[in-house]
Amino acid sequence: MDGIKYAVFTEKSIRLLGNNQYTSNVESGSTRTEIKHWVELFFGVKVIAMNSHRLPGKGRRVGPIKGHTMHYRRMIITLQPGYSIPPLIEKRT
């Protein structure tokens, strides 16, 4: 579970759930094969395809000092029909 940070819930990612595609942010140093192996092992599913893209870090400013956050990678994981991943929503109190 080292590679996957958290699941992403945006309008597009919720729409992709209908196509059996799950979206999550992963560590920027992780490879596609590592993430695929981990998802298949942990959730017991079969992965058909994985698409990834790297999102740039956002600019931040504290007084006169300018900086930016770290970039991260987002994966869209497509599963075989009949398989699904349980919801990854944490309960907030």
From Swiss-Prot:
It comes from the Eukaryota. GO terms for cellular component: chloroplast; ribonucleoprotein complex; ribosome. It is found in: Plastid, Chloroplast. Its main location: plastid. HAMAP family: Ribosomal_uL23_B (MF_01369_B). Belongs to the universal ribosomal protein uL23 family. This is Large ribosomal subunit protein uL23cz/uL23cy. The gene is rpl23-A.
